[in-house]
Amino acid sequence: MIIVTGGAGMIGSNIVKALNEIGINDILVVDNLKNGRKFKNLVDLDITDYMDRDDFLTQIMAGDNFGPIEAVFHEGACSATTEWDGKYMMLNNYEYSKELLHYCLEREIPFLYASSAATYGETTVFKEEREYEGALNVYGYSKQQFDNYVRRLWQDAEEHGETLSQITGFRYFNVYGPREQHKGSMASVAFHLNNQILAGENPKLFAGSEQFKRDFIYVGDVCKVNLWFMQNGVSGIFNCGTGNAESFEEVAKAVIKHHGKGEIETIPFPEHLKGAYQEFTQADLTKLRAAGCDVEFKNVAEGVAEYMAIVNG
């Protein structure tokens, strides 16, 4: 069996779909369906079982046996970069992750987890090294702290001549694609621009967006990276982006091209995001490629075109 936490979320449900596509359906999805709309992400997927996050954590902390587990994809987290309740964020993204990690280490279960490019903050260098990290929000800090916890475990193991079972963290950059409709304001720019055009409006970008460049990665490519590491058993913390930064304007142009209408409008940059907003991200893929991962990534034009074809079917 494979366990996917956050399995009803955007990345989690796409990982389940990718597993289904290679013939794997013995999957336990763990999530919190308080936001009931997320169920739609599971409707067309083939899974063995579903478990509420709190019930799952209770069983994990009790050391319960789930039977043979081939791997755990830990995608479950509070991913709202605008959430400032640090106690809530650290409990969800740090403490719970440690519990699950140790459960997996004790049983030598491969543990593949979601980190984030939010760990980098304002740097212009995006290498998986401590000197370039400095989160701008509490979400990024929770991910940064868990990465550092994992690093300490590796260091301790090395000092004692031990080898840990697989732990692989993925620093997701700006992920977009199908199954994000439940995310509200946290959904991708492509999602919001598409909805604006469908509503008969022009697509709207923040003033200065031509200067803001991000590494936008299509969710299908994120899944390919996850599956490659599951199949190859490589440990480490790796960037999961395309290696190229493109502007928000490029995203808007790709959405406009799909619809054949619309002109970009600018709106004022929100006060609450000033000082807590990454204006530039671009994954350094040196470490990913050195590990042997040869997944090729779609650019914005290609990825958004595929996304629009799916959601506007």
Curated annotation (Swiss-Prot):
Its cofactor is NADP(+). Its EC number is 5.1.3.20. Binds 1 NADP(+) per subunit. One of its GO terms (molecular function) is NADP binding. It comes from the Bacteria. Pathway: Nucleotide-sugar biosynthesis; ADP-L-glycero-beta-D-manno-heptose biosynthesis; ADP-L-glycero-beta-D-manno-heptose from D-glycero-beta-D-manno-heptose 7-phosphate: step 4/4; Bacterial outer membrane biogenesis; LPS core biosynthesis. It catalyses: ADP-D-glycero-beta-D-manno-heptose = ADP-L-glycero-beta-D-manno-heptose. Keywords: Carbohydrate metabolism, Isomerase, NADP. Substrate binds at residues 174, 185, 192, 206-209, 214, 277. NADP(+) binds at residues 10-11, 31-32, 38, 53, 75-79, 92, 143, 175, 183. The active site is at 139 (proton acceptor), 183 (proton acceptor). GO terms for biological process: ADP-L-glycero-beta-D-manno-heptose biosynthetic process; lipopolysaccharide core region biosynthetic process. Catalyzes the interconversion between ADP-D-glycero-beta-D-manno-heptose and ADP-L-glycero-beta-D-manno-heptose via an epimerization at carbon 6 of the heptose. Belongs to the NAD(P)-dependent epimerase/dehydratase family. HldD subfamily. Contains a large N-terminal NADP-binding domain, and a smaller C-terminal substrate-binding domain. Homopentamer. This is ADP-L-glycero-D-manno-heptose-6-epimerase. It comes from Vibrio vulnificus (strain YJ016). The lineage of its organism: Bacteria, Pseudomonadati, Pseudomonadota, Gammaproteobacteria, Vibrionales.
